[in-house]
């Protein structure tokens, strides 16, 4: 058995039988069905003859008779009798809401097929109902006749339809259900089919006990309440399903509400059900109070759809009044009451009428009986001897209805003990009483007349339930008196003792006394009639007695008779539970005590109340000024001193003080035995303690809240909580705040008029009036005012505000300023209690001028503590600014404080000039003012007064004056009164400034600065102008001091001596620097440094080992192949040339190879004796000249790396060589050369480029090798860089030197003129340079930054592939640079289409080779061929000498090999570990060459792999067109070029010693 309302979702309905689904679909109503029907009627209709193929079984539906609220369903079968057409069933609709079909969607019926659908009949009214259901198909529209009859529901349930309400109306009608059975009716389930219709108990809850769901037999009981909120306009319908235990019956109640589109007045309870009413047993009028909700004052008037006598609408009380006595016969009322407002219906905003459904069943007649038979009154009137009480009585009832009356049951609503009353039922409980028939129903026997009782006889009939009163009472009234104040509290009246004396105490003489009240309360269950009343007083007393009337006693607060008239009504009898009140006031003219009498007569007694009083002269009153409760609010104990002023002539001894307010007030007398009030004076009696929380209890405006979200809501107005867009001006609960302020106002009004009763020995209890003032607690006790009337624009002003906790408990508070972004969108309507309304002219500013420097999280402030917070203000525009300081706390929820400030511009003028004015403050001196210096008076002073005026509203404080950078005085100017002063608003002051001339210049200009409290200092210009002739005259007349000449001579001597000492110190310092630098250079290369771990060093070692093996094999192959002869030839030729030509010298390093060749041709060495220098890539020098493979194009190394210690060579003066013009490669077609010139060329190249060995030694005795100093090895002695002085020296030498070149001897050949290039020359002298290890390295450019500034990475990286040339070693040619000209070239010449690769071995015969003959400069293939033809005879002559030298070289070959191995080891040990030449470069490469027996090992350029295979050789390019033998091709290779490391090589600009070497080179050039 469920114990609560089961409001199941829509899914619960679908789980029920098919009948529930049908009823839910029925919610569309007649209107929806009609629209649906019209929609389908618009479809294309089929020919009428197609309807003959349709057949409905049954062809007509008759549902019979069913009660209202019960649904009935029948099945209809549709047959498609067509042979080959498919029937499409679209919809089934009807005009009556009582019939509905369960058909959903569209359905197709195949030929000769059938389908079924259900038709539901749910009657909504009584009587027969007939209609035609329209069946829309593809064959046409068929009709199905349906009919049924609705009968009265035995449970008295009716549909709720036709109710109209405005938008946002909340409707809560109640549903009553009747139990027609002889046993209780148990309700199992109640739920709604629509989610908008919520169900709740009649009491408002959602759960209830089990007996709440049980309806007693023959009883009408409210079972459920529907709650509906109209959020959207339109029709809203649903079904309320009630499932009872009686045969598992389901009852359905249709509910339809129409929500109007506008807001207006409405009634929450739109169903007024009076039930069944008997005209004779009903009271005078039945009223149904409408719960009308209205947002403004309106006058309502109602009208019914039909005029019904006895049914009216009371607009003043918003009640529906049913007067059953006005109905002449039986009547069933099921009508709508339409209620309108007084606004015009023709206006656009006219209110919409709402409706109330009124139901009632009026039965003319009733069940009559003798009322005295059920009433036992045990007291007889006083002084009247009446008949004795009749204890046995008989109850006879009579049927006054026009229909027979069936009595089902008779019972007592309240049980009565059998010892008090004996009730006996006569006959069968079920009695049928015909119209106008009387039946004896009960017999009553009163056994105890001293015990009163009250109950009702409940008679259940087929018409209604009748309740007959059954009571026993005495009929006497309870009498009580109350002087001065009438207290109508129910508990006070019940506790009041029976009192027949009213003591008015001491009353003023000859003045009207205060009122006294006599209260007669009727505790009997029957009304008591007042027959008469009268007040009797003495002759010397004037009295006023008034019958106030009757009223109920259940009132929770004292009643003011003058102001509160609600609830009083005039009466002739006092109803049960009511009280009658008489008011008495007297005015006596007797000093003695006297009394009067009030008499009241009733049918059962005569009441006599004695009123006594005594006259006295004087009165007492409370001094309200001293009775001040400061800072009083709930949660705090308030206290004040009670002072009473007495006008009596005798003292009054206070016995005690009582308050009319029963709780919250307590009095403590200063004297434990009672204070005596002195006559005609003011006396402090005691102290009153007041606790406001005890008075307001649960309705206090200050309460302890535990809901943090209510105190500190994070999102205003229940927003979406989106951070960044929150308006912090609304971060408070506005609804809660207004509720609390309203509670505060109510409590303040209640406490504004209070009274206390003073009990004394001399006087009767006196009532004294006083009031208690409560406050709304404020955290900010005062309104902050800026310290100055205005604040300067741009100035930062800080104001301190103190927040104080006024309570004794800890306070959680949070404060923040209004967000300027929401200033224009914020509408504040805060109560006056939380915001100061005095600043009504303030508006929230939308500029960020106020700030809280120390704002943070909420703070817990202890009780009584204070917190000082700073608020800064700074504005950039002059204007008045206002903002709110929001303070949230758990005490008052919210408090707002207006902050206002005004920003203004300072207005200051000095000498009628604005600050920073261009015009100076002029001190102009005339000629006559200088007469004083001629007469002996040297002082020439002029004084001017300037006005400092503050024309603004900001007070300005002048702190001081600065002239220049000195205070008050500087360079002749002086402020006479330099003390600071203040300038108020529109205030001015004179400032005097004096100028005293010193006769040094005719114009003096200085700046005057005024130090102020503004955000800036005020500056002006001071200008003194004097006549020049007067100044000179006065300066000449000045007497010079005697020591001036001596001081001048002494200073001159000191200066000259200081200059000499500086020169001497510079010489010694230079020598010390040179010594220190030389020692540093020597110490740096003193020993090998521990190299860093570098994988390239490992590669070097492996390459050297492979080169050593290859070299040994190569020497053997040379001996076998007869190459010694050629080697001897080259050696002889080399020796011969070395004798005849000047000794070559090492030129300064230059990126211009042609310039280098010029320098190398200047002199020839006398003796070619050198220690072999092993390049880093070679493991050991070759014992004999060997053919070298072609090298791949990689980065060119411009200078060789210092890998060994070279031998110094004696150098003779060089010859000046004429610059050789550059020959563009590729301008002439390469000629086919024979093998002989190629061989000769290779021999010469090999002799020139290979490292000098012992077989190349001339017959002259060898000079012992001299080890060069360490500075030459690290490049410190090399000249690097390019300077104009060196260029001019080189040009001079080039003019004097004659260049002999065989390339110009050809017929018709004209040597092109080489243009001067821009060279990157680091200026090394021949004396300080160390020879490179390999001349071929000069052609190697390993990095683009080694070239001139015109060479980029693009030029280096562009290396297109050239045609491969097979040299016998399966090597491929490298790609040549496409557009990389000579370094330093100005690009004026045409770019040759074919240039050498980025990395290629230099030929020994090339003009830019270090070991080349000075007469040879091979630039193009034609030039090389012609030179070979000219030198061919010379090579033949030298061959014999080479053969003889070769024999000498064979003997020391082995010894030479060992020496080279040792040198190689030493070189590796001295190698710089940070060699950048080993770094990888992204230039074109493929693989390194494989070490092959019989060939020299070639070291690749930096960044290439060990298997690089792309090389390019100029000599190989020349012979690529013609055949060459294997030996000749092998000999055509040149010695391995030495790589240049741009950071560690001797001539590198990144070398550590470059700066020292550059300095030395410059010094050498100067020499």
Swiss-Prot record:
Disruption phenotype: RNAi-mediated knockdown in fat body results in collagen accumulation in fat body cells and defective secretion of collagen into the hemolymph.
Residue ranges of coiled coil: 1096-1130
Residues the record lists as Phosphoserine modifications: 1201, 1258
Region annotation (Disordered) ranges: 1112-1337, 1364-1386, 1502-1567
Signal peptide: 1-32
UniProt superkingdom: Eukaryota
Record's keyword annotation contains Glycoprotein: yes
Cytoplasmic topological domain residue ranges: 1071-1567
Transmembrane segments: 1050-1070
Compositional bias segments (type: Polar residues): 1247-1259, 1319-1331, 1507-1519, 1536-1561
Family: Belongs to the TMEM131 family.
Subunit field text: May interact (via PapD-L domain) with collagen proteins (via C-terminus); the interaction is direct and is involved in assembly and TRAPPIII ER-to-Golgi transport complex-dependent secretion of collagen.
Biological role stated in the UniProt entry: Collagen binding transmembrane protein involved in collagen secretion, probably by recruiting the ER-to-Golgi transport complex TRAPPIII.
Protein name: Transmembrane protein 131 homolog
Source species: Drosophila melanogaster (Fruit fly)
UniProt lineage: Eukaryota, Metazoa, Ecdysozoa, Arthropoda, Hexapoda
């Amino acid at each position: 058995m469920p114990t609560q309302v089961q409001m199941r979702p829509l899914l619960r309905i679908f789980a029920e039988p098919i009948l529930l689904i049908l009823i839910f679909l029925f919610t569309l109503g007649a209107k929806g069905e009609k629209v649906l029907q019209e929609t389908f009627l618009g479809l294309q209709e089929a020919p009428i003859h197609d309807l003959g193929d349709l057949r409905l079984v049954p062809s007509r539906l008759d549902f019979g008779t069913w009660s209202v609220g019960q649904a009935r369903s029948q099945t209809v079968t549709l047959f498609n009798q067509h042979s080959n057409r498919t029937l499409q069933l679209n919809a089934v609709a009807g005009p009556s809401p009582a019939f509905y079909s369960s058909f959903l969607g569209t359905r197709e019926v195949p030929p000769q097929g059938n389908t079924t659908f259900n038709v539901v009949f749910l009657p909504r009214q009584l009587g027969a109902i007939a209609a035609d259901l329209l069946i829309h198909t593809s064959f046409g529209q068929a009709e199905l006749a349906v009919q049924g009859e609705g009968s009265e529901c035995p449970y008295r349930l009716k549909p709720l339809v036709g109710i109209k309400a405005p938008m946002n109306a909340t409707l809560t009608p109640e549903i009553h259900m009747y139990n027609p059975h002889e046993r209780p009716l148990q309700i199992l389930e109640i739920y709604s089919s629509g989610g908008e219709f919520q169900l709740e108990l009649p009491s408002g809850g959602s759960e209830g006990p089990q007996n709440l769901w049980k309806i007693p037999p023959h009883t009408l009981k409210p079972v459920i309440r529907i709650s509906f909120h109209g959020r959207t306009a339109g029709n809203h319908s649903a079904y309320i399903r009630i499932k009872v235990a009686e045969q598992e019956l389901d009852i359905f109640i249709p509910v339809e509400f129409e929500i109007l589109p506008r807001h207006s007045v409405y009634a929450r309870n739109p169903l007024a059900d009076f039930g069944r009413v008997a005209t004779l047993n009903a009271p005078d009028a039945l009223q149904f109070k409408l719960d009308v909700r209205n947002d403004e004052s309106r006058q309502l008037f109602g009208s019914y759809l039909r005029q019904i006598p006895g049914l009216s609408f009371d607009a003043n009380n918003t009640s529906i009044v049913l007067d059953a006595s006005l109905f002449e016969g039986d009547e069933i009322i099921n009508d709508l009451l339409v209620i309108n407002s007084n606004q015009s219906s023709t206006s656009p905003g006219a209110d919409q009428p709402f409706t109330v459904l009124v139901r009632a069943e009026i039965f003319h007649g009733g069940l009559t009986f003798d009322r005295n038979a059920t009433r036992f009154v045990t007291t007889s009137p006083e002084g009247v001897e009446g008949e004795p009480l009749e204890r046995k009585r008989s109850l006879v009832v009579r049927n006054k209805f026009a229909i027979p009356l069936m009595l089902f049951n008779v019972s007592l609503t309240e049980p009565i003990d059998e010892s008090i009353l004996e009730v006996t039922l006569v006959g069968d409980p079920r009695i049928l009483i015909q119209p106008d028939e009387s039946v004896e129903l009960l017999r009553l026997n009163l056994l105890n007349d001293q015990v009163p009782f009250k109950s009702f006889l409940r008679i259940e009939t087929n018409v209604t339930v009748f309740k007959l009163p059954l009571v026993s009472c005495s009929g006497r009234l309870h009498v009580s008196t109350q002087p001065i104040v009438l207290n109508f509290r129910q508990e006070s009246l019940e506790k009041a003792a029976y009192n027949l004396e009213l003591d008015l105490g001491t009353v003023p003489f000859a003045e009207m006394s205060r009122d006294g009240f006599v209260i007669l309360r009727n505790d009997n269950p029957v009304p008591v009639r007042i027959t008469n009343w009268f007040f009797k007083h003495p002759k010397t007393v004037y009295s006023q007695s008034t019958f106030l009337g009757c009223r109920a006693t259940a009132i929770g607060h004292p009643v003011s008779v003058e102001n509160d008239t609600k609830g009083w009504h005039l009466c002739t009898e006092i109803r049960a539970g009511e009280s009658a009140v008489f008011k008495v006031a007297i005015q006596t003219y007797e000093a003695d005590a006297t009394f009067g009498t009030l008499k009241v007569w009733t049918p059962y007694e005569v009441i006599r109340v004695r009123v006594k009083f005594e006259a006295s002269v004087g009165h007492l009153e409370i001094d309200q000024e001293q009775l001040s409760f400061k800072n009083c609010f709930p949660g705090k104990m308030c206290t004040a001193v009670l002072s009473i002023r007495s006008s009596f002539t005798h003292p009054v001894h206070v016995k005690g003080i009582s308050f009319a307010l029963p709780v919250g007030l307590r009095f403590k007398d200063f004297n434990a035995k009672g204070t005596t009030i002195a006559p005609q004076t003011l006396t402090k009696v005691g102290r009153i303690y007041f606790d406001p929380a005890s008075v307001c209890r649960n309705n206090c405006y200050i309460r302890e809240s535990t809901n943090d979200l209510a105190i500190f809501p994070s999102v205003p107005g229940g927003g979406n909580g989106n951070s960044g867009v929150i308006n912090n001006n609304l971060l408070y609960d506005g609804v809660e705040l207004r509720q609390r302020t309203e509670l505060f106002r109510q409590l303040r009004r209640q406490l504004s008029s209070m009274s206390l009763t003073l009990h004394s020995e001399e006087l009767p209890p006196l009532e004294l009036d006083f009031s208690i003032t409560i406050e709304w607690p404020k955290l900010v006790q005062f309104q902050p005012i800026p310290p100055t009337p205005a604040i300067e624009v741009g100035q930062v002003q800080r104001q301190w505000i103190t927040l104080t906790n006024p309570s004794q408990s800890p306070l959680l508070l949070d404060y923040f300023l209004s967000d300027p972004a929401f200033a224009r969108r914020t509408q504040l309507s805060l109560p006056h209690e939380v915001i100061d309304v005095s600043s009504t002219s303030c508006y929230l500013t939308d500029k960020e001028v106020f700030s809280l420097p120390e704002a943070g999280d909420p703070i817990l402030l202890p009780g009584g503590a204070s917190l000082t917070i700073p608020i800064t203000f700074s504005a950039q525009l002059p204007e008045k600014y206002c903002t709110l300081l929001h303070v949230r706390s758990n005490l008052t929820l919210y408090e707002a404080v207006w902050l206002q400030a005004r920003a203004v511009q300072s207005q200051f003028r000095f000498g009628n000039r604005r600050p920073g004015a261009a015009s100076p403050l002029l001190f102009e001196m005339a000629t006559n003012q200088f007469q004083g210096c001629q007469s002996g008076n040297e002082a020439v002073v002029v004084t001017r007064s300037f006005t400092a005026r503050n024309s603004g509203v900001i007070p300005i404080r002048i702190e001081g004056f600065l002239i220049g950078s000195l205070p008050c005085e500087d360079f002749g100017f002086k402020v006479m009164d330099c003390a600071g002063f203040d300038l108020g608003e529109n205030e001015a002051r004179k400032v005097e400034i004096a100028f005293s001339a010193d006769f040094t210049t005719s114009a003096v200009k200085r700046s005057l600065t005024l130090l102020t409290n503004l955000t800036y200092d005020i500056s002006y210009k001071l200008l003194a102008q004097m006549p020049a002739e007067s100044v000179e005259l006065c300066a000449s007349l000045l007497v010079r001091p005697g020591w001036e000449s001596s001081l001048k001579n002494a200073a001159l001597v000191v200066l000259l001596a200081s200059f000499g000492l500086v020169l001497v110190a510079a010489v010694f310092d230079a020598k010390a620097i040179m010594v220190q630098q030389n020692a540093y250079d020597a110490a740096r290369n003193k020993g090998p440094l521990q190299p860093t771990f570098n994988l390239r060093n490992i590669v070097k070692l492996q390459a050297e080992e492979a080169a050593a093996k290859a070299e040994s094999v190569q020497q053997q192959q040379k001996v076998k192949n007869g190459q010694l002869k050629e080697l001897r030839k080259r050696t002889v030729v080399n020796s011969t040339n070395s004798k005849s030509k000047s000794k070559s010298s090492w030129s300064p390093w230059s990126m211009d190879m042609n310039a280098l060749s010029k320098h190398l041709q200047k002199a020839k060495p006398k003796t070619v004796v050198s220690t072999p220098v092993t390049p880093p890539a070679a493991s050991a020098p070759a014992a004999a000249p060997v053919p070298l493979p072609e090298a791949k194009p990689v980065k060119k190394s411009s200078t060789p790396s210092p890998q060994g210690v070279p031998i110094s060579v004696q150098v003779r003066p060089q010859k000046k060589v004429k610059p050789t013009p550059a020959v563009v490669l590729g301008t002439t077609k390469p000629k086919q050369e024979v093998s002989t010139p190629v061989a000769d060329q290779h021999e010469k190249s090999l002799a020139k480029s290979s490292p000098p060995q012992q077989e190349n030694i001339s017959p002259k005795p060898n000079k012992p090798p001299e080890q060069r100093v360490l500075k030459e090895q690290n490049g410190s002695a090399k000249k690097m860089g390019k300077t104009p002085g060196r260029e001019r020296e080189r040009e001079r030498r080039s003019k004097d030197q004659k260049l002999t070149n065989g390339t110009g001897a050809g017929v018709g050949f004209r040597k092109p003129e080489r243009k001067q290039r821009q060279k990157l020359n680091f200026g090394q002298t021949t004396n300080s340079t160390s020879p490179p290890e390999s001349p071929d390295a000069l052609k190697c450019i390993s990095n683009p930054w080694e070239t001139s500034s015109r060479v980029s990475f693009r030029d280096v990286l562009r290396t297109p592939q050239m045609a491969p040339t097979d040299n016998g070693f399966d090597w491929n040619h490298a790609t040549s640079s496409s557009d990389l000209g000579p370094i330093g070239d100005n690009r004026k010449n045409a770019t040759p289409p074919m240039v050498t690769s980025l990395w290629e071995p230099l030929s020994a015969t090339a003009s830019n080779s270090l070991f080349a003959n000075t007469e040879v400069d091979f630039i193009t293939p034609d030039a090389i061929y012609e030179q070979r033809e000219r030198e061919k005879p010379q090579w033949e002559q030298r061959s014999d000498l080479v053969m003889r030298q070769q024999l000498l070289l064979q003997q020391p070959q082995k010894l030479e090999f060992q020496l080279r191995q040792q040198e190689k080891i030493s070189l590796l040990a001295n190698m710089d570990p940070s060699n950048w030449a080993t770094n990888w470069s992204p230039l074109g490469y493929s693989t390194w060459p494989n070490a092959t027996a019989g060939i020299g090992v070639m070291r690749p350029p930096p960044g290439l792999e060990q298997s690089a295979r792309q090389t390019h050789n100029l000599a190989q390019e020349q012979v690529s067109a013609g055949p060459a033998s294997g030996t000749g091709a092998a000999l055509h290779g040149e010695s391995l070029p030495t790589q240049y490391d741009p950071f560690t090589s001797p001539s590198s600009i990144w070398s550590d010693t470059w700066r020292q070497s550059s300095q030395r080179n410059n010094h050498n050039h100067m020499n």
